[in-house]
């Protein structure tokens, strides 16, 4: 039986989807390995926990857990400005938080794994604190002088780190990293990365750039990427941003992101029912925090809806659209239904244009589609013809099977 590979991420709640994309990319390319994922964060929502648990259900080779970190001490060390948050500093604590582990792999959450990580994991770290890839961008701008490093000193990109946790604990490196970050908070431009390179100087092992191929590399052809194991989307513009310039790299990210979206589809009905319950409870209790939470979850669901989501009632577009229409008709949320549901309506129509009714299936496809259209038409003032009333009576009798009524 193969040993388990522990892999760490350090993120905030806003980055969970990107982290999950990274996780899925690992698992799709390393199904024969035993992997334990550890997520270091200051908070995690119920929906994020459910998404991580669903990933566990899909991939049998992985266990996923999260560790809640007290962020206050790290916030004081965060340099003002920039797009990098204090959560990246959580990696300092890995060795001391997990004394049962002697070795681990740390990954930033803005990367994808496009091959086997087993050769990387098996690298010998004897005599080294960590291993990483030479940072090409830093070499180009001659940044070492600012950090008082010589040209012979190694400077790595800290987005991919193979860690010798045993030696990091023994030599109390966490304490030294925190102290360095505090002292040089105004000098060090890349904070935790600078601290790691300075404190671990002389004990950093260089590894091939196939394990941390950054956007500083200038060639982004499919042929160039065929041998790359880890693609790291450095910089403030990411592949999920519309203005991201490198199409080949963006397509690779979208490939793995589509996998996580399919897993997320399995949770849509549960999230919609919870949204309705939260809005109902907030109305009864006048609790604004509950209402804000429900509104945030509703926006999360709407943002996820696209023609790629199944048209089904259960965990699909019709069920989500029906739930939102119900919220509007019960005045649990305010707004124009045509405007709010435009995105879902468009997605539903797009699927209908591409597929026949027989392709959709009766129970999960056509019946859900009919119920969604019925409920949408109920919002119209003139929806009171004899035929319409018969349809209303029919669906009212079947209402319990649609969970909402």
Task: Spell out what each predicted region is.
Residues 1-11, 21, 163-264:
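A glycosyltransferase accessory/donor-loop signature
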Residues 111-146:
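Conserved donor-nucleotide/metal-binding helix-loop-beta segment in metal-dependent transferases, i.e.
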């Amino acid at each position: 039986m193969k040993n388990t590979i522990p892999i760490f991420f350090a993120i905030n709640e806003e980055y969970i989807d990107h982290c999950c994309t990274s996780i899925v990319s690992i698992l799709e390319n390393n199904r024969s390995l035993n992997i334990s994922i550890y997520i270091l964060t200051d908070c995690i929502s119920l929906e994020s926990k459910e998404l991580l648990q669903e990933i566990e259900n899909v991939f049998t080779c992985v266990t996923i857990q999260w560790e809640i970190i007290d962020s206050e001490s790290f916030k004081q060390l965060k340099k003002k400005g920039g797009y990098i948050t204090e959560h990246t500093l959580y990696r300092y604590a890995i060795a001391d938080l997990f004394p049962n582990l002697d070795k681990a792999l740390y990954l930033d959450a803005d990367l994808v794994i496009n091959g086997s990580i087993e050769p990387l994991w098996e690298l010998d770290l004897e005599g080294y604190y960590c291993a990483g890839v030479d940072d090409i961008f830093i070499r180009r701008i001659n940044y070492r002088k600012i950090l008082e490093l010589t040209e012979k000193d190694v400077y790595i990109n800290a987005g991919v780190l193979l860690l010798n946790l045993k030696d990091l604990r023994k030599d109390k490196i966490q304490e030294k990293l925190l102290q360095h970050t505090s002292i040089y908070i105004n000098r060090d431009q890349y904070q935790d990365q600078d601290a790691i390179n300075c404190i671990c100087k002389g004990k950093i092992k260089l590894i091939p750039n196939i394990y941390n191929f950054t956007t500083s590399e200038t060639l982004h052809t499919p042929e160039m990427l065929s041998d790359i194991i880890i693609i790291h989307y450095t910089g403030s513009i990411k592949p999920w941003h519309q203005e991201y310039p490198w199409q080949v790299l963006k397509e690779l990210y979208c490939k793995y992101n589509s996998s996580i979206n399919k897993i997320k589809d399995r949770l849509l009905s549960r999230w919609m029912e919870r949204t309705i319950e939260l809005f109902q409870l907030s109305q009864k209790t006048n609790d604004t925090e509950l209402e804000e939470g429900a509104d945030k979850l509703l926006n999360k669901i709407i943002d996820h809806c696209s023609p790629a989501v199944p048209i089904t009632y259960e965990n699909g577009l019709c069920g989500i659209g029906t739930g939102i229409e119900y919220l509007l008709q019960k005045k649990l949320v305010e707004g124009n239904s045509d405007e709010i549901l435009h995105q879902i309506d468009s997605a539903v129509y797009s699927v209908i244009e591409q597929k026949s009714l027989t392709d959709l299936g009766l129970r999960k496809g056509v019946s859900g589609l009919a119920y969604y259209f019925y409920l949408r038409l109920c919002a119209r003032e003139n929806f009171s013809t004899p035929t319409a009333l018969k349809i209303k009576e029919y669906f009212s009798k079947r209402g319990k099977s649609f969970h909402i009524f």
